[in-house]
Regions:
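Conserved ATP-driven motor cores of ASCE-family P-loop NTPases powering translocation/secretion/packaging/pilus
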Residues: 43-45, 68-88, 286-372
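Pre-Walker A (Motif I) flank of P-loop NTPase domains
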Residues: 14, 22-27, 53, 218-222
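Conserved P-loop NTPase motor module
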Residues: 5, 108-114, 125, 320, ...
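Membrane-active amphipathic alpha-helices enriched in small hydrophobic residues
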Residues: 448-459, 468-496
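N-terminal pre-Walker A segment at the start of P-loop NTPase domains
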Residues: 1-15
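The conserved Walker
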Residues: 29, 33, 276, 305
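P-loop NTPase motor domains
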Residues: 45-55, 62-286, 312, 356-357, ...
Length: 501
């Protein structure tokens, strides 16, 4: 199987390639803003797609969408391709599927609250340890009572139930404070305003739909529209982490293949690790270490190589380092880290060259036969065949119209789950509370004959019309009954739905 051509070595005048059989050994693409990282990602995605490997990546700036349409074939690109040795270079599109958590620029991406789980949901909600513990109790309570947590309404309903039965739940599951519940409810409200209502629900994303191969044998490139999503860093990074965890948990062990089953590109990777607790970082490290045996290659993209923790950085065998500008002590440290992580090349002063690289140039080291990293090469990156810029709305609509997943995800499904079941139980409670009062009124009316009727006739007269005194008496009775009924409804439904009317 032909390797993926990344570019041409300037240092040793050789073709710099990535071996497909080692594509699952993960990778890193790093460099300052404007140095060509996005073009490198597009070249990687195209290369894997041509080999029949599906790719999933986020489009943070909008220009990755250009993968879906052919390039312009500009003279400078043709010249660069000839210099690098790209055979038969011609503009070409890649098979793509657009996804969007908000459902505007692609197929909606959804998962259920249960599938996300309390740990990752707590990260999205930015809860502290105490509040995270209460969220664990909410999930445990849902399991014990057979209540499905599918969407935000279900989560709000369970939080209301916990608030209503707080004392009993605290005795059985552990202390639950009203303050913690209120804090979680406020966080849920913020998440809903940030688009959580669209993300949580059904139909949930099926992994098979991001691992498709088209009829020509090319891997489909799944592009997640993230230009708005990245403005919510916790939601963006946690969604990608959830997706990576789902791949790890659901895919079977396959060992080393001749090419990966999927390549997962994580742009703006620093967002994944910012403020992440040690336990979560340890989990990510475990997933990255083990997921390669399931045929998945993970490629992180960020400005600085040390944005990725050292234990994870050490597992990234294929590296492309674009220019770093050493203006600050932070930048100087990053340059030193980058230089130390490459296999030395006696012809190259890595620390010096890093700050002198031009746009479209990079220091590259990939794994060769037997998994041995090649000495670092200053490399001229090969141009992609697609458009190096965003597509138009009309072009996007055309791609979506031909999507192989059709309209499967375009319409949300709201099946019976926790919110509906708790509402039904609340309604039954209200009906049971009102039933005795109704029976009492029937008995009173039955007793209006005989002695009771004689008394009534003596006081109010025999005509079947309400006098002022009777009218006032009945209005008073109805008012008291209505207020009591409303209080019961508010007490039950208000607790379940967090005060929502």
């Amino acid at each position: 199987m032909d390797p993926i051509l990344l570019g041409k070595g300037i240092t040793d005048d050789i073709a710099v390639t990535l071996l497909p059989k080692l594509g699952n050994r993960h990778g890193l693409v790093a460099g300052a803003t404007g140095t060509g990282k996005t073009v490198t990602l597009m070249t990687l995605a195209e290369g894997f797609s041509r080999l029949g490997v599906p790719v999933f990546l986020a489009d943070v700036k909008g220009d990755v969408s250009g993968l879906a349409v052919p390039g312009t074939g500009a003279e400078n690109l043709l010249k660069r391709a000839a210099e690098i040795g790209v055979a038969d270079y011609a503009p070409a599109a890649s098979p793509t599927i657009f996804w969007d958590l908000y459902g505007k620029l692609g197929h909606p991406v959804r998962t259920t609250v249960s599938e996300m789980g309390p740990t990752l949901l707590a990260r999205i909600l930015e809860l502290n340890d105490t509040q995270s513990g209460v969220l664990d109790i909410v999930f445990k309570l849902a399991d014990d009572r057979g209540l499905l947590l599918l969407d935000m309404d279900d989560l709000r309903a369970l939080l209301g139930l916990v608030a209503e039965e707080r004392k009993d739940i605290s005795t059985e599951y552990g202390l639950v404070s009203a303050q913690s519940i209120a804090a979680i409810q406020r966080s849920v409200l913020r998440l809903a305003q940030d688009g959580g209502e669209n993300f949580f629900g059904e139909p949930a994303l099926e992994l098979a739909d991001i691992m498709r191969v088209n009829h020509d044998g090319r891997g489909m490139i799944g592009i997640l529209a993230a230009d708005q999503l990245v403005l919510k860093p916790k939601l963006y990074s946690t969604f990608l982490l959830w997706l990576l965890s789902e791949l790890f948990e659901q895919l079977p062990e396959v060992g080393d293949l001749d090419k990966p089953k999927l390549v997962f590109i994580f742009d703006e990777a620093h967002l994944l690790f910012d403020d992440a607790p040690p336990s979560l970082v340890q989990r990510i490290e475990q997933v990255v270490r083990l997921i390669r045996s399931k045929g998945v290659g993970v490629y992180f993209c960020s400005q600085f190589p040390d944005d990725v923790p050292g234990n994870i950085l050490g597992q990234l065998g294929n590296r492309v380092q674009h220019a770093l500008r050493a203006f600050t002590p932070r930048d100087q440290k990053a340059v030193k880290t980058a230089a130390e992580t490459f296999v030395p090349n006696p012809k190259l002063d890595v620390a010096k060259v890093l700050s002198q690289l031009g746009t479209g140039e990079a220091l590259v080291s990939t794994l060769q036969d037997k998994g041995v990293p090649m000495p670092v090469q200053q490399t001229m990156i090969a141009p992609p065949h697609c458009r190096m810029g965003p597509i138009t709305d009309a072009e996007r609509a055309q791609v979506r119209a031909g999507s192989p997943v059709g309209s499967r995800y375009d319409t949300a499904i709201n099946r019976e789950s926790a919110a509906e079941l708790l509402a039904q139980r609340a309604q039954k409670t209200v009906e049971q509370a009102q039933a005795p009062a109704a029976r009492s009124r029937e008995q009173d009316e039955a007793q209006e004959g005989g002695f009771g009727q004689a008394i009534k006739d003596a006081i109010f007269g025999t005509k079947r019309r309400q006098g002022m005194i009777e009218t006032m008496a009945k209005q008073t009775t109805r008012t008291v009954g209505t207020k009591l009924g409303n209080q019961i409804v508010r007490g039950i439904l208000g607790g379940i739905f967090g005060g929502k009317r």
